[in-house]
Amino acid sequence: METYPKAKRHLEYVAFFDFELSTMEGPAHVFLAVDAYSQFAFNLGVEPDKKPESVLKNIYFLTENEEFVRYMENGFTLVLGEYEELSDRINAIIRPVNGKLLFSKSFNSYLSNPVLISFRDSLMHRKRKE
């Protein structure tokens, strides 16, 4: 079993990820981030696609989020499981605000899975009530 670093402060590691929902208009990609230390989930936006512009826009939205800004003076590491081809453009967004970039699919999954499982469980619970 792989071991991962344990966050010792807010925003030390922040997983950025998305999941797809089906809608009447077609797929919708929900972009989220989660702070490994607090487990706080940032709801960044919903886009019709995962094009580079959509990904970059939502990373920018993260750096402007009020809760995120509150803790970013000590820097942050953005953990992504994909989008390596956008690394230069992502760094252009996060470096000026004291951010670093880490690509690790397994670490990203480790950090994001609790949020995704909680979301799934919430939907299933809601469905059972109907």
Question: Where are the model-predicted features located?
Answer:
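Short, glycine-anchored, charge-dense loop/turn motifs used at functional sites
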Residues: 37-40
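Active-site beta-loop-alpha junctions of metal-dependent nucleic acid enzymes
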Residues: 44-70
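RNase H-like two-metal-ion nuclease catalytic core shared by retroviral integrases
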Residues: 78-82, 87-130
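Intrinsically disordered, low-complexity boundary segments flanking structured domains
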Residues: 1-6, 65-66, 87-91
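Short acidic, S/G/P-rich loop/turn micro-motifs used as interaction or catalytic elements
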Residues: 20-24, 48-50, 83-87
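Mobile-element integrase/transposase regions
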Residues: 1-30
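Short His-Asn-centered micro-motif
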Residues: 16-17, 34, 80-83
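Short active-site oxyanion
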Residues: 73-77
